Each structure stands twice: as C-alpha cells, then as structure tokens.
Curated annotation (Swiss-Prot):
InterPro entries: cNMP-bd_dom, cNMP-bd_dom_sf, Env_Response_Regulators, HTH_CRP, RmlC-like_jellyroll, Tscrpt_reg_HTH_Crp-type_CS, Tscrpt_reg_NtcA, WH-like_DNA-bd_sf. It holds the Pfam family HTH_Crp_2. The gene is ntcA. One of its GO terms (cellular component) is cytosol. GO terms for molecular function: DNA binding; DNA-binding transcription factor activity. This is Global nitrogen regulator. NCBIfam families: NtcA_cyano.
Amino acid sequence: MIVTQDKALANVFRQMATGAFPPVVETFERNKTIFFPGDPAERVYFLLKGAVKLSRVYEAGEEITVALLRENSVFGVLSLLTGNKSDRFYHAVAFTPVELLSAPIEQVEQALKENPELSMLMLRGLSSRILQTEMMIETLAHRDMGSRLVSFLLILCRDFGVPCADGITIDLKLSHQAIAEAIGSTRVTVTRLLGDLREKKMISIHKKKITVHKPVTLSRQFT
C-alpha cells in the first residue's frame, strides 16, 4: 500500500478493508460520547465529517477541553505512540454531528510499519494537535472570560476558519452552550460576551456560524 501526499488518510483506512476486521463507518450526534477515559484502547479513529472534542476529566468532576479535532484528524492513537496496551486517556465527544472511520489498532500499527510515509502523515497531524492543546491551555489560563472567549475564537479561526470577504468564518455551527462548555463558562455569560463583540463589530453570526472581522485586531485588543 503506497501512500502519496495527495492520498487522504481516509483512503488509507479504507484500504485496510482486506483485513479480518475491516474499518467501519460510525456516526455520532452532538454531545454523544465516542469513548470514555478508562475504556480499552482497541481502535483508532479517523474523522470524516464534523468536529470532536477531547477533554480530561478530573476527580472533582471538572472537565477541561484540551483539543477540538477537525475533519481528516486521527485520534485514539496513544497505544501506538507508547507501544503498550493502554486505556483511553481522554473523553472524546462529538462537538458537532460527526462521521468517522475506525479500525483495529493492530491493523493501523501494521500499516505504519509498512508505510513510513503514512507515519509521517500521522505525525504531522499529531504535531498540529499538540500545538492546539498548548493554545487551549493558554486560553483556559485566562481568568477573564472575555479574553478566554476571544482566545477560543481565534483558535477556531486557525483550525476551522474559511476566508471570506468580511474576515474569517468559523466553519462550525456553534451553540452558545457548546462554546460555554469548551471554555469553562456558562451559556448566559457566553451570550452576553458574544453580544458585546457583535456590538463592537468584531464578529457577526449567521445561522450559528461566527465570522471574525480582522482577527489580528481582535487579538491585540482583547488578549
């Protein structure tokens, strides 16, 4: 199985269909759990559509978002990195309705051994996720919720943004509740803060999609 730069990882997953346990397509509605911390790490996932939230759950019940995964992301790969069988470390939840491919971890491990180029593709994706996790940690370090919200919007611009005439549109339908859960706030607070940004012409919202006008100006003023 030769991996070329223009071949999506999704196609690589599908080419594993000749194995005894072929990849399967799964769908999850928003807020549905894909796996819990402590679940056996038996499969690797490839995100076809939508966005997935990875979070850590602590003993006090607090849940901290560490990453938002976009289409063409691979996740559930900790056992591949450590070389040891392990349980899930994160709570993976559908941030939007999602469609994904999953394959047994043994098959993915074999594919990585046979295809160094595939390993590089996955490594690039993991590097991007590490950067996003660092940015999320910085976001949650803000005590001021206004700064926290703006930092989160800028992360979404980076990872889900589509350039448009008015700025950058975040290509996700975001409810106020979903944003609140991601930044550790409340829906009421998020609604108020988004309203303030709209009044200042910093953002606009159409059909739950947020457009950020002049992201650089926004970052300088609020973060």
